[in-house]
Amino acid sequence: MSVTQPLFSTIEPDEETTAPSGNIQDNRSSKPRPEPIVLTPTTRSTSSNSNAQNTMASNEGDAEAGIAGIFRQSAHPLALFFLYFFRIAAILVYILCGWFTDNYVLSTVTVVVLLAMDFWNCRNVAGRTLVGLRFWNQVDEDGESYWVFESRDPSRPANPIDSKMFWIALYVFPLLWGALLIVSILKLGFAFIPIVVLALVFNITNVVGFTYADRDAKQKWANSVVGGSWGGIGGIGGQLLTTAVKKGVGRVFG
């Protein structure tokens, strides 16, 4: 190689490249476009959630409803139990005694004992603990008898479940004994009518006594509220009147 030969003549030129022509979007559109993927939510999770919610709701309903739920929410479950136990036992013994024994005296004594225990328990234990009411008949020195009603302090309200179940037991069972009296008359079972009449006497006595005791308690509470409000208004009015008189006297003689 001679020195005088130029250097660029020895370098091979690059290959000629043609610039792309046409519309680029046309080239892209010529290729097949992939189908769009649509994501749809599955119902598996929602169904599982709904099943879980239904399961939880049923569990809560089972926890809050039924006999077990009532006793669980009661503030005095033992008193509530014996209130219904004596009443249901007296009716069951009266209805089923003829199927197990033909001894009329034994059946009568059993029903009367259950009725007496229910009468004492309802008046002295269940009424006092479940609704805060109590009543008794008292005879003074002159020989006159009168009813005495006792009620709980209004600041300590009764449990709603206890109150509801107590009043249900108080009013429903006399209706059941009344129905049994009608059945005894229709079946000409006159031997058992005295037992039903005694049951009605015990139950109606409790109904009347606790109804009047509840009315007396509400009246006392209303009187105390009204008396307290009027007393408060009177105290404020007295203070305002005293202040106005003092200011008026000071202006006249000042």
Curated annotation (Swiss-Prot):
Pfam families for the chain: DUF846 (PF05832)
Entry superkingdom: Eukaryota
Residue ranges with Polar residues bias: 18-27
Compartment list: Golgi apparatus membrane
Membrane topology per record: Multi-pass membrane protein
Residues passing through the membrane, by range: 80-100, 104-120, 166-186, 190-210
Annotated GO CC locations: Golgi membrane
Ranges where the record places region Disordered: 1-59
Composition-biased stretches (Low complexity): 40-59
PANTHER family tied to this protein: GOLGI APPARATUS MEMBRANE PROTEIN TVP23
Name of this chain's protein: Golgi apparatus membrane protein TVP23
Organism, scientific name: Coprinopsis cinerea (strain Okayama-7 / 130 / ATCC MYA-4618 / FGSC 9003)
